[in-house]
Amino acid sequence: STCKMDIICQPIGTYTEEGFKRGVKNMPLPCEEAFSVNADLLKTIFEDNDVFNFQIGYLAQNNNIKAMVDGDKLFSKHIAVVGSTGAGKSCVVAKLLQEAVGFDNGLNKNKEHQKNSHIIIFDIHSEYTNAFKLVESEKFNLNLLNIDNLKLPYWLMNSEELEDMFIESNDQNSYNQVSQFKSAVIKNKIVKNNNSNVNYDTPVEFDIKEVKNYLENLNRERVDKKDKRTPILDDGTEVEDRYEKYFSQIFEFKQSDTNNGPYSGDFTRFVTRLETRLSDERLKFLLSPKKEDGTSFHSNDFQDILKQFIGYIDDNKSNITIIDLSGIPFEVLSTTISLISRIVFDFAFNYSKLKHISGETNDIPIMLVCEEAHNYIPKSNESQYKSSKKSIERIAKEGRKYGLSLMVVSQRPSEVSETIMAQCNNFIALRLTNTNDQSYVKNLLPDNIGSICEALPSLNPGEALIVGDATLLPSVVQFKMPNPRPKSETINFLSKWEENWREITFEKVIKKWRKETTT
């Protein structure tokens, strides 16, 4: 007896003497013969194409055939890398970036001539440092920024970031708080920079402690009982200009023959919040950062602050900048990411505009890698993520025009901002076990890739479905392990539990917890 099988096929391209092209002009007739593609033809389709010049791995069904993509389209258009915990996301990201900057099995192919790649990684769990540290003889300079050496003075924040940091949006006096805080910041910027042409968002120096003094004086203020306007200090001095007087120190006010000032008692919680923030040792990197010589940052240090993010650190040019956010307190994570993202975008925007004047395009394109993206650019509209979402969504919508692309990495793609995911042109999907995430990713992908998506929950570690503008065909690819590897190994609980009892130096843990210096 003859065994009959029904095979459901999806036409995806046409192969002729001129080679393979995506898309089908003339559909085959029902009675025409069908053949399976042999290995030689697959090799021709995937490897014999000059446009597809960047290897990302090997075809999962035949590991003798290289999986090639268009490198320009891969990195110049936003990429989403998604997959459940343990599927191999960190290794895939590390391998892609190692190939992009010229790593070859732990060696630096470009050590004789520095190349022009600029990649910034938001590293939430301190995983990627290991993946980009080579021996000194390979001459690869990794630019590692963390809470101890990050130069990020608070006066670079814009209005939204400042208010996220210092003002409770649900406080009944939040309107007055914003109004007076804004006025004080602008006035202090004018004083500190001797320039009246500044606004709330101008990235120039101001003194947050002086702003706090101003607000506390408003909160204490007593005014003349007769005119009900003029503040009177305890020594009888009449205050003619609040800004000129109140920045310098906190004053006592005359109690007799005076009334409460217009904001008396209204800012008590606000001032307490400011004091709490300013005294928090964990926030020193942001609220009281110091240069190497121990002095504070000023407006004319802006160039050095900017250069750290794109790899221009003194003479140590760096293709990879890792921003290790593992030590950043969660309550300011969104603000920190927003500030850095916005600085990088504004640089790319203004550099591109300068190039456009002379008819050129941006010649130092930058990729921003958002690891664990669901933690700070979520789909939800919670106020604590407002600033980071706004900054990165702007990059997603406008960045490519100015030479700034995104790589969005997440184990929960269904929880990432839809605005950002919808702007991704290339998808690398590793094993996904959550049905919501599977459905979400399927809805983002083209309709014509058919049942290949059904493989998502059963992919092996390091295997990924590759779809997008950079690929010749939707394919399941096996990525090779990066060398060196990121530090993302799972702790072996049972093995550790079976070891002998370990003592803990609790003092060191607590010092680290409090961000004190450990010895």
Predicted features, each with a name:
Residues F122, C370, V409-S410:
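Hydrophobic residues in beta-strands of the RecA-like P-loop NTPase core, especially within AAA+ ATPase
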Residues E168, E393-Q478:
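Conserved ATP-driven motor cores of ASCE-family P-loop NTPases powering translocation/secretion/packaging/pilus
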Residues P461-T519:
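Conserved P-loop NTPase motor module
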Residues S1-G83, C91-V92, L96, N105-G106, ...:
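Basic- and hydrophobic-enriched, low-structure N-terminal and domain-boundary segments
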Residues F75-S76, Q114-N116, N316-K317, T361-I364, ...:
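Short loop/turn elements that form and flank the Walker-type P-loop nucleotide-binding site
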Residues S126-N130, W155-S391:
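P-loop NTPase motor domains
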Residues N176-Y200, E454-R485:
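Conserved AAA+ ATPase small/helical "lid" subdomain
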Residues Q55-L145, E418, I466, W497-E498:
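Glycine-rich phosphate-binding loop of nucleotide-binding enzymes
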